[in-house]
Amino acid sequence: MIYQSPTIQVELLEDNIAKLCFNAPGSVNKFDRETLTSLDAALDSIKQDSNIKALVLTSSKDTFIVGADITEFLGLFAQDDAVLLSWVEQANAVFNKLEDLPFPTASAIKGFALGGGCETILATDFRIADTTAKIGLPETKLGIIPGFGGTVRLPRVIGADNALEWITTGKDQRAEDALKVGAVDAVVAPQALEAAAIQMLKDAVAEKLDWQARRNRKLSALTLPKLEAMMSFTTAKGMVFAVAGKHYPAPMAAVSVIEQASTKGRAEALQIEHQAFIKLAKTDVAKALIGIFLNDQFVKGKAKKAGKLAKEVNNAAVLGAGIMGGGIAYQSASKGTPIVMKDIAQPALDLGLNEAAKLLSAQVARGRSTPEKMAKVLNNITPSLDYAAIKHSDVVVEAVVEHPKIKAQVLAEVEGYVSEDAIIASNTSTISINLLAKSMKKPERFCGMHFFNPVHKMPLVEIIRGEHSSEETIASVVAYASKMGKTPIVVNDCPGFFVNRVLFPYFAGFNGLLAEGGDFAAIDKVMEKQFGWPMGPAYLLDVVGLDTGHHAQAVMAEGFPDRMGKSGTDAIDVMFENKRLGQKNGKGFYVYSVDSRGKPKKDVDPTSYGLLKDAFGELKAFEADDIIARTMIPMIIETVRCLEEGIVASPAEADMGLVYGLGFPPFRGGVFRYLDTMGVANFVALADKYAHLGGLYQVTDAMRTLAANNGSYYQA
């Protein structure tokens, strides 16, 4: 053994080829500080052994290296610039040491080689992947750019255009696609991987392959003609900004770094990368996006723990077909859990099956599935008009019409057809789980399971714990949601649960602006372009449906009369009473037509302005800051109330619920990250300016205390 540490082992193979194996404790290899230090020491040991003629990098895991240890980032990025620069320079010295070894090097890549893992393989002369490999630099998704030489080496390996696409999108690349652009030199079967890498090194040692010429290309400037370079980078800037926009600076910074570094040798190019990396690491956007990644891991970790308590779900059922039932059936079946789709009407079953078939056909058309896989998934969906079909189901999801009496009747019926230990969950967005549980003989086997529409696109599922729901019931439904590929958060029962409870105060703020003559299209523009929502409040209400919004608003008003009670007609009422239901009937705040791709296209409609003018008078302009404050303050305070009341268990889960359930702008990180970034004291001062608008604008006592103590919701 040439070198050994808890994360890396180096041994000498025959023909004096050294093998460096990444073998960290746990299921994957990460580039944490310990691994980086070990790699540095391992390379020193390798350099000192004069017998070594070549080096192959391997992994003992199913993956190569999944990337840096992101749990270290927030603490590290909080350091001052000099400390951060020192860390980046020290890390890069290790990668340079690998690249500068006096003999050929190769990486044998299986599974993920992402971020620092990708930058490791770029520092070697040859790269051989097996068919499972996925390679990429996802750093821009975290608000930063690659910091271990990725922006320098990748363009010199695969060309500037390809590197720009890889880095600015942050997407993983399959082995075959990496081979096409020259990121890897060969793709082989998993069992042949190490042997193929070693053979390539033998050929390099025997001078059949020119490893030094390859290396020199990585150490030199890019060989791009000046005019071609100018056109390439100008085009890239336009395309990247069109996608990333002003709120996500990392992709544009990556283009700029690659452009500036293209005419430099390695040392100067790396310095350009270092400076840009440090600048981005200090941004609120990076903190927010890294926070989302960590919160996502936290939520998934809780779901994994729940899986240990869960009853295994091998068969499921959904009651109520149609679009929602079909979406749930598709999601369950496509992730491997057979499901019965039960309804009382054949047309509804047909609609549900058609919905599943449509989603699967789209997967096939995009090359993400095959006709054979599509047939297998459809065979996993059993349509039925008879309750007898659900008797072997481990979990039954009730998804009938959103009416308490109908749901209660169906829940009471279904209990008589399933086994004693079957779990029943209600897909409801507003109806109290404790109320529905009253119709159950075994309320401990019952909880809520709130899917968001469209089911196949929306990552969140709210699992609602009723006062009688057992831990096994909650754990089992959490595990089932995870198995379906969803991100579950567990919330306690209250009107609107968590997501709708915090959404409707936002709509109330919007209604308040319109009642004073606000222009809904102007409000949408501010909330989309400046705050960063994917849809403004008027557009969102049209998509949700004004009938749905009207009903849910009434539920919230009844549940929280002090804050959400209504004193008169609002804009939602005006649209609903005039049968303007939104996209579903082609007219709401906006009017809708179908574009050439069959998608709804919205246009401003004078009729809706006329109706609002009749109700609220002439239009009045509001400042953008006013619009943001009046819509967001109620949502933020209500989110804090949910945490204080134990409706949601942690800031992390609340923020993930908002990002995944409502599309809260990821670059802001969620309500609690936004509050911490703004400063709780600054938010309290802002809210106090609007406190005269009513209870929704009045902060809690606990918020005032936190503000007075200069506290935060996340611990750094």
From Swiss-Prot:
Keywords: Fatty acid metabolism, Isomerase, Lipid degradation, Lipid metabolism, Lyase, Multifunctional enzyme, NAD, Oxidoreductase
Catalytic activity line of the entry: a (3S)-3-hydroxyacyl-CoA + NAD(+) = a 3-oxoacyl-CoA + NADH + H(+); a (3S)-3-hydroxyacyl-CoA = a (2E)-enoyl-CoA + H2O; a 4-saturated-(3S)-3-hydroxyacyl-CoA = a (3E)-enoyl-CoA + H2O; (3S)-3-hydroxybutanoyl-CoA = (3R)-3-hydroxybutanoyl-CoA
Gene Ontology terms for molecular function: 3-hydroxybutyryl-CoA epimerase activity; delta(3)-delta(2)-enoyl-CoA isomerase activity; enoyl-CoA hydratase activity; long-chain-3-hydroxyacyl-CoA dehydrogenase activity; NAD+ binding
Organism, scientific name: Shewanella baltica (strain OS155 / ATCC BAA-1091)
Name of the protein: Fatty acid oxidation complex subunit alpha
Binding site for NAD(+): M324, D343, V400, V401, E402, K407, S429, N453
Pathway connected to this protein: Lipid metabolism; fatty acid beta-oxidation
Active site: H450 (for 3-hydroxyacyl-coa dehydrogenase activity)
Catalytic activity, EC: 4.2.1.17, 5.1.2.3, 5.3.3.8, 1.1.1.35
Cysteine pairings via disulfide bonds: none
Region entry Enoyl-CoA hydratase/isomerase, spans: 1-189
PROSITE patterns: 3HCDH
Functional note: Involved in the aerobic and anaerobic degradation of long-chain fatty acids via beta-oxidation cycle. Catalyzes the formation of 3-oxoacyl-CoA from enoyl-CoA via L-3-hydroxyacyl-CoA. It can also use D-3-hydroxyacyl-CoA and cis-3-enoyl-CoA as substrate.
Keyword Thylakoid appears in the UniProt entry: no
Taxon lineage: Bacteria, Pseudomonadati, Pseudomonadota, Gammaproteobacteria, Alteromonadales
SUPFAM superfamilies to which the protein is assigned, alphabetical: 6-phosphogluconate dehydrogenase C-terminal domain-like, ClpP/crotonase, NAD(P)-binding Rossmann-fold domains
Assembly with partners or alone: Heterotetramer of two alpha chains (FadB) and two beta chains (FadA).
InterPro entries attached to this UniProt entry: 3-OHacyl-CoA_DH_CS (IPR006180), 3-OHacyl-CoA_DH_NAD-bd (IPR006176), 3HC_DH_C (IPR006108), 6-PGluconate_DH-like_C_sf (IPR008927), ClpP/crotonase-like_dom_sf (IPR029045), Enoyl-CoA_hydra/iso (IPR001753), FA_oxidation_alpha_subunit (IPR050136), FadB (IPR012799)
Matches recorded under HAMAP family: FadB (MF_01621)
